[in-house]
């Protein structure tokens, strides 16, 4: 049985990313730069925009199962998914989601979001959004995304201790539930002492949420919002 050619996968992935996103990407040469799992039928290629540190992952599969030249490798490859699209969707939708939450948490909060397409077909190795997904005027709003796509949203909110309320779950659910179809929204609301919160807020505003670091809070609510037919009880 043929295996996957990691150099060819990297070549196809790089061309796909440059063509779709019009950025100058490079395949990364750090650890496990191209993780190939040929026996599982997929490969992972990591890339980054030249001059930037953040890496993105592309999931590859053989385009058919031929090995016509009998060199032990599949002849060709296709991209199944990538997670660069996650950043594009996250940045746009976060603004709207924060705006909705401001109707509940009227004072201070900071937040982080991660959105991925739901792997309805259970494709092994799927990560991020499918290669045929496009972010356009039909789905580039919160309402449009939840109406037209099957997505999984992970949303984390941090507040000072004196702002925390157990009513947040009920109130946020009431706002967001009417918008969803086959989507799932996972929400965590965490409180911190005022001094700790202000330190985290400062880093968030100056450098972004990724630079804050994990820290157990004083109180926490974790809940899912799903459509009525499969709602978590």
Short names for language-model regions:
Residues 1-30, 89-105, 170-177:
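Short, non-transmembrane alpha-helical segments in secretory-pathway proteins
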Residues 24-62:
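Exposed beta-strand-loop-beta-strand "reactive/processing" segments of non-cytosolic proteins
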Residues 75-208, 213, 218, 222-233:
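Metal-dependent nuclease catalytic core centered on acidic motifs
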Residues 46-48, 65-66, 172-178:
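Short, low-complexity, polar/charged sequence segments that are solvent-exposed and flexible
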Residues 36, 49, 70, 123-126:
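Intrinsically disordered, low-complexity segments enriched in small/polar residues
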Residues 54-84:
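A short, surface-exposed beta-strand/turn
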Residues 18, 36-38, 144-146:
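Sterically constrained small-residue positions within well-ordered secondary structures
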């Amino acid at each position: 049985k043929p295996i996957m050619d990691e150099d060819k996968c990297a070549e196809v992935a790089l061309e796909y990313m440059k063509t779709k996103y019009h950025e100058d990407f490079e395949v990364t040469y750090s650890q496990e730069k191209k993780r190939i799992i040929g026996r599982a039928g997929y490969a992972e290629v990591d890339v980054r925009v030249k001059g930037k540190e953040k890496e993105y992952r592309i999931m590859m599969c053989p385009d058919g199962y031929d090995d016509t030249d009998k060199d032990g490798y599949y002849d060709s490859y296709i991209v199944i998914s990538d997670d660069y699209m996650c950043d594009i969707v996250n940045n746009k939708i976060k603004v709207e989601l924060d705006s909705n939450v401001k109707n509940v948490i009227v004072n201070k909060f900071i937040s982080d979001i991660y959105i991925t397409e739901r792997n309805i077909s259970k494709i092994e190795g799927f990560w991020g959004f499918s290669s045929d997904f496009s972010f356009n005027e039909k789905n580039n709003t919160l309402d449009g995304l939840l109406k037209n796509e099957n997505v999984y949203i992970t949303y984390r909110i941090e507040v000072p201790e004196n702002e925390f309320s157990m009513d947040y779950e009920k109130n946020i659910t009431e706002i967001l539930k009417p918008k969803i179809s086959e989507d799932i929204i996972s929400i965590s609301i965490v409180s911190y002492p005022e001094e700790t919160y202000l330190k985290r807020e400062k880093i968030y505003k100056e450098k972004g949420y990724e630079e804050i670091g994990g820290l157990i809070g004083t109180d926490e609510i974790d809940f899912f919002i799903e459509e009525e037919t499969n709602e978590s009880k």
